[in-house]
Amino acid sequence: MQVTQLNLFPLKSAQAYSVQQVFVQAQGLSFDREFMITELDGTFVTARKDKILYQFSVLPIPQGIVLCYQQTQYVVRYVDFKQMQPCEVWGEVFLSYIADTQVNHWLSSIFQREVQLRWLGVESQRQLTAMAKPMSFADSNPILLCSQKSLHQIQQWAPVEVTMAQFRANIVIDGQTAFAEELWRVIQIGEVMFEFVQHCTRCVMITRDLQTHELNPHVEPFRTLKTHHTNARGKPIFGIHLIPQNSGIVRVGDRLQVIRSEEI
């Protein structure tokens, strides 16, 4: 088995930025979910509610990032983030940097309400108690791995076209058997050892059309997963969450080795 895709999501809930190699650190993949848009009170903005986020993409540059929206580009420098204020992701409150007024004014004009751009900073102030490690702006775990073999099985079940992009995986592998990854507990890819945290439970976000940005009227492929592939609590699952055990580089084409798995 080997890695076929590496995807970063520099801005939470926005478009993927695909790379051929990535540096893995304690908080996850470097440059993944290091930025997010929040309300004025620091509450995170998500594409579950604001589909406009799917129209944003981010390009890295040495001094910061380029925010791209439709035909507009806006250069945001790291030095533009000076003030730290509390922010919130799924009820967890921690400090992050706020972009300057000009950046936030531009974003607010797009969202048609006042919002802010946040940056984790060089060192994340967020730390999940269960992990005892720094964490990005990701929902609950730093890295998501999905298998193309598992996707193929979902495509066989679903009455609509389903793509890997809908599942927003960081690491995509070719796989050998559908859903075999759900039994892995420790794996190695390239220079990095990863430990299984939990299966990825899915929400209606996977039903959003990546071209029109509208939710599928038949709630697919969420409904298909709900019918065919759930955890013990009846929640649809696809992919596994991982935490890195060390730092190092992972590349497209790297071999995946299963170090330890759970017996059926």
Each model region followed by its residue ranges:
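Metal-cofactor-dependent catalytic cores
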Residues: M1-I264
